Amino acid sequence: MAAVTRYSGKVVVVTGGSRGIGAAIVRAFVDSGAQVVFCDKDEAGGRALEQELSGTVFIPGDVTQERDLQTLVSETLSRFGHLDCVVNNAGYHPPAQLPEETSAQGFRQLLEVNLLGTYTLIKLALPHLRKSRGNIINISSLVGAIGQSQALTYVATKGAVTAMTKALALDESRHGVRVNCISPGNIWTPLWEELAASTSDPRATILEGTLAQPLGRMGQPAEVAAAAVFLASEATFCTGLELLVTGGAELGYGRKASKSSLGEVPTLPPNVH
């Protein structure tokens, strides 16, 4: 019974809620007693989840369109009268690209989804979150802190999400609004599966992603969702926090250089033969 009531009576908005981590977050908040309003460009997926889960409202929307986000907030307030938590989950990871293969146009488009959509919804929701002394949870990424090869633009957007979280936490503390972010590592989602399928050897890509964690597996969307419910409910003394849900992928030393970057012979320290 405690799990059902831990966020009872609260109203939560989730972006990108139709599948993967977003759908798991919607489900977890409903299981915790909240009313959840979620948006996604995938209308069919959103309608299906809305039909499956009582306590949810789906509103089709694109986070790059401010009008859609205005509708998301206004519909939430019209139906429920208040807003307690915003989860900025919508985001995209492009296929692997070398730096010279990226473009300014592609970077701008990614910024619109991964960063500016988050910023815009925060601005629209803040007056209402201040009234409820609510909280914001931004979904960032481990690679925003540690980097990732062939993901220059994605890493930049997620690093910015984490930095924005910390800056906003300082500004909003005086209003009693907590602002935190979750940085997942390798989580087995439809997007991860699609990215693997775009490589020359999907099975090898999946194996590499699996072995990146000391725990020896990828995470599940429900594990990220559990972290989100914790931040919204029990974590009342946490703000500006980046919560890593990574299976320990960032831990330890490991091989970083490739033969192409070393040349034929590695450069060893003096007196090493």
From Swiss-Prot:
GO cellular component: cytosol
Pfam family, one: adh_short_C2
Binding positions (NAD(+)): R19, I21, D40, K41, D62, V63, N89, Y154, K158, I187, T189, L191
Principal location listed in the UniProt entry: cytoplasm
One example GO MF annotation: identical protein binding
UniProt xrefs under PANTHER family: 17-BETA-HYDROXYSTEROID DEHYDROGENASE 14-RELATED, SHORT-CHAIN DEHYDROGENASE/REDUCTASE
Name assigned to this protein: L-fucose dehydrogenase
